Amino acid sequence: MQKVHRHGDKRSCGATTEAQGYSNVFVNNQPISVDRDPNSHGGGALNAQCRNVFVGNKLVVVVPNDSDADALCPIPGHCNPKSDSGSPDVYIGQ
């Protein structure tokens, strides 16, 4: 089972996720992260790899999921700033 990724959770590059795709579903009082949510460095859209859980017709992001490069690429770590942290007690099985 994998942790659910949320707004403000860390990315592997040190940025945080900016949950923008859906704002009415919360996990531990934080908006849930869904496919294509960017990070605080600009860009870095997440590529949700959860196959079975959707929010507003978008796949939910879990830890770790890959992402597009953010605005600081080609600096190491910024060309795939994966989801790196998540809820301490909400998990999704694949």
Predicted regions and their residues:
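Intrinsically disordered, low-complexity proline/glycine-rich segments
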Residues: Q2-Q94
